[in-house]
């Protein structure tokens, strides 16, 4: 059977998978689509072999996974698609209630890290469905919105205070942030080397043809082509040394606030040749 590869349905994943989706890279794996939390579950249960998966998922199940080198969905400053909204300064949320989107994993832990480490508070939280619910109507004092919902102001309530968590992390640590890394739960070493080579070629195609692809897929994602082009331009898709240091720092903070037992060692698949 061919490898199965998860594909996050948000537009932020597209540049890495563009060559596979657009047919420029042949012989790729079978693809399964979903939001990050859904793909995390499939990966954990062994129902898919590889996926761009929430970086916190690796930390929670590091014994099961290996990270595919060089690939990330990350930011070096503002990310645009991870927004924290409310009506007061975050430092005033100690006795407040914060709504967390059920579609998220890493972004929720990132917000908890920032609330504790940057703003010095630990408010109550509850889950909400960002596609269907107004969390402020349920009594939230602040709420986190992620993905393509966060990119569409008409889909979330207007609030007085707005923070981009990519920028907040950068300001707090001076490091990039890795929201998702490609993780392998199955597949032989040879299959994973081949997939690594295919993914690098797919990413190269996506970045080289970014503007043209933004025009071609604008209707699919529901954004103007110029907006999509700029959004992809500002994201980071290369897991370099600085991004890896940001990932390690995130894991250390997550352990310090009790979201994971300990910061895991990073285990990698082998690189494909070429």
Regions found by a protein language model. Give the residues of each.
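Pocket-lining segment of extracytoplasmic ligand-binding domains
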Residues: 127-216
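Short, polar/charged alpha-helical segment
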Residues: 9-34
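Short helix-initiation/N-cap motifs at beta->coil->alpha
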Residues: 30-41, 121-142
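Short loop->beta-strand "edge-of-pocket" segments that line small-molecule binding or catalytic clefts
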Residues: 2-9, 91-107, 196-202
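A conserved helix-loop-strand patch within extracytoplasmic ligand-binding domains
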Residues: 72-132, 169-170
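Secondary-structure end/capping motifs
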Residues: 188-253
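A bilobed periplasmic-binding-protein/Venus flytrap-type ligand-binding module shared by bacterial periplasmic
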Residues: 19, 81-91, 177-191
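Beta->alpha turn/N-cap motifs
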Residues: 11-12, 35-36, 46-64, 71, ...
């Amino acid at each position: 059977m061919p490898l199965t590869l998860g594909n996050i349905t948000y537009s932020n994943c597209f540049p890495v998978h563009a060559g596979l989706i657009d047919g420029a890279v042949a012989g790729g794996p079978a693809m399964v689509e979903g939001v990050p939390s859904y793909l995390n579950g499939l990966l954990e249960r062994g129902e898919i072999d590889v996926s761009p998966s929430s970086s916190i998922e690796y930390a929670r199940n590091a014994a099961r996974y290996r990270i595919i080198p060089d690939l990330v969905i990350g930011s070096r400053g503002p990310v645009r698609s991870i927004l924290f909204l409310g009506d007061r300064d975050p430092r005033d949320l100690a006795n407040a209630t914060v709504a967390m989107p059920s579609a998220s994993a890493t972004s929720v832990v990132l917000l908890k890290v920032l609330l504790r480490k940057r703003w010095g508070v630990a408010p109550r939280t509850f889950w909400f469905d960002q596609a269907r619910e107004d969390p402020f109507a349920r009594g939230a004092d602040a709420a986190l919105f992620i993905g393509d919902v966060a990119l569409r102001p008409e889909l979330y309530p207007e609030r007085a205070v707005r923070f981009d968590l990519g920028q907040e992390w950068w300001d707090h640590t001076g490091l990039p942030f890795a929201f998702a890394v490609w993780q392998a739960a199955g597949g032989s070493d040879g299959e994973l080397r081949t997939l690594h080579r295919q993914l690098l070629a797919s990413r190269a195609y996506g970045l080289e043809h970014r503007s043209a692809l933004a025009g071609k897929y604008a209707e699919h994602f529901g954004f103007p082509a110029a907006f999509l082009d700029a959004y992809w331009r500002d994201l980071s898709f290369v897991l370099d040394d600085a991004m890896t240091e940001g990932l390690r720092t995130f894991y250390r903070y997550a352990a310090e606030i009790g979201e994971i037992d300990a910061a895991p060692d990073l285990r990698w698949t082998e690189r494909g040749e070429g």
